[in-house]
């Protein structure tokens, strides 16, 4: 009974969420679009003609923002283990980023070129066990960072979702070895009770 009450409370809060209503009105697939928009505007992440890789893309709101920002001369490559309704201008790969074959498929569509921006909103299947969820989230963030080491152009940027916890500082130090500057972002569209943060690596060193 408690879980049913919790579900009803979540649904009510979701329906009354200003960002949810705004996303529905403006045609974005989720409220997450405004997280990326806020960070992108603050830190000037996008420019026309960029090649963007969007990890954990489904349902596609970050890819929508990326497509709007890079324009017709840009490219957006989206990846998620969940299906995503097609977006004109975006190339979507469905699969688990942890599997070598899926990574190889992404490398194939990149066709030997590197990205100008990597954005990752990947999240594990949350269990409610904070320590476990945080550890799995950090593992996905580390995979995204490893991808950047090989496939992000020097001097370019990397935005990744992480969860506050015991491994947070260690992961930030990993990023600091690869980027000239690493900053923390908590956009307004990120719910107050959420432990999620975003780390932004600016100007990849190598």
From Swiss-Prot:
Gene3D superfamilies: Vaccinia Virus protein VP39. Belongs to the class I-like SAM-binding methyltransferase superfamily. RNA methyltransferase RlmE family. GO terms for cellular component: cytoplasm. It comes from the Bacteria. Its EC number is 2.1.1.166. This is Ribosomal RNA large subunit methyltransferase E. S-adenosyl-L-methionine binds at residues 60, 62, 80, 96, 121. It is found in: Cytoplasm. Its main location: cytoplasm. HAMAP family: RNA_methyltr_E. Specifically methylates the uridine in position 2552 of 23S rRNA at the 2'-O position of the ribose in the fully assembled 50S ribosomal subunit. Keywords: Cytoplasm, Methyltransferase, rRNA processing, S-adenosyl-L-methionine, Transferase. Pfam families: FtsJ (PF01728). It catalyses: uridine(2552) in 23S rRNA + S-adenosyl-L-methionine = 2'-O-methyluridine(2552) in 23S rRNA + S-adenosyl-L-homocysteine + H(+). One of its GO terms (molecular function) is rRNA (uridine-2'-O-)-methyltransferase activity. The active site is at 161 (proton acceptor). It is an enzyme of class 2 (transferase). SUPFAM superfamilies: S-adenosyl-L-methionine-dependent methyltransferases.
